[in-house]
């Protein structure tokens, strides 16, 4: 069992029940999934960029990504429906907890001028989205093999009903919020 999953079951659930006044253990919010997405507009001109991005995403998450395609054509961007424009990975269970643990303890501290993550990026339902400007903060990425710096989005989906519940859960998980 992942270290963070064990910590959640043994320490975080009782702490959240006491803190939020839950009567039933099933009311306690938990992580559902983590979606890591890399959108690549440059893939319209050069499809090889997509291959390197997929390899990097697979190295970061430990799971093979799905190539995302354009939903509709946009003439201004020279984009046709069905063209590959990015890649995404959905992590659940053990891999989800392991990824979040690595993100909090190893990757986020490697961000330049890091003062914590914003507490305002919740969606109103307790889910949190985080943007990473460069993939080099992950130790799995070899700096010499990177041809272009790419950003990625990380969405953490929880069962929390409100942003306050979601923030309390993620704070206990170790996410360093600024305010």
Swiss-Prot record:
NCBIfam families: PRK00010.1. Belongs to the universal ribosomal protein uL5 family. SUPFAM superfamilies: RL5-like. Keywords: Ribonucleoprotein, Ribosomal protein, RNA-binding, rRNA-binding, tRNA-binding. This is one of the proteins that bind and probably mediate the attachment of the 5S RNA into the large ribosomal subunit, where it forms part of the central protuberance. In the 70S ribosome it contacts protein S13 of the 30S subunit (bridge B1b), connecting the 2 subunits; this bridge is implicated in subunit movement. Contacts the P site tRNA; the 5S rRNA and some of its associated proteins might help stabilize positioning of ribosome-bound tRNAs. It comes from Citrifermentans bemidjiense (strain ATCC BAA-1014 / DSM 16622 / JCM 12645 / Bem) (Geobacter bemidjiensis). PANTHER family: 60S RIBOSOMAL PROTEIN L11-RELATED (PTHR11994). The keyword rRNA-binding applies. Pfam families: Ribosomal_L5, Ribosomal_L5_C. This is Large ribosomal subunit protein uL5. Part of the 50S ribosomal subunit; part of the 5S rRNA/L5/L18/L25 subcomplex. Contacts the 5S rRNA and the P site tRNA. Forms a bridge to the 30S subunit in the 70S ribosome. One of its GO terms (cellular component) is ribosome. GO terms for molecular function: rRNA binding; structural constituent of ribosome; tRNA binding. One of its GO terms (biological process) is translation. The lineage of its organism: Bacteria, Pseudomonadati, Thermodesulfobacteriota, Desulfuromonadia, Geobacterales. Disulfide bonds: none annotated.
């Amino acid at each position: 069992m992942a270290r963070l999953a064990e910590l959640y079951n043994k320490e975080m659930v009782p702490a959240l029940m006491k803190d939020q006044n839950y009567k039933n253990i099933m009311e306690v919010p938990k992580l559902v999934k983590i979606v890591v997405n890399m959108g690549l507009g440059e893939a319209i001109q050069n499809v090889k960029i997509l291959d390197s991005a997929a390899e990097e995403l697979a190295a970061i998450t430990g799971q093979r990504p799905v190539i995302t395609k354009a939903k509709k054509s946009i003439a201004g961007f020279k984009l046709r429906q069905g063209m590959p424009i990015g890649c995404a990975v959905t992590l659940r269970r053990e891999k989800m907890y392991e990824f979040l643990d690595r993100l909090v303890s190893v990757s986020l501290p490697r961000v330049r001028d890091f003062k914590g993550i914003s507490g305002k990026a919740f969606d109103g339902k307790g889910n949190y989205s985080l943007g990473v400007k460069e993939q080099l903060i992950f130790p799995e990425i070899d700096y010499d093999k990177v041809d272009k710096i790419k950003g990625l989005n990380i969405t953490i989906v929880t069962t929390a009903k409100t942003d306050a519940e979601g923030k309390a859960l993620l704070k206990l998980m170790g996410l360093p919020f600024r305010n």
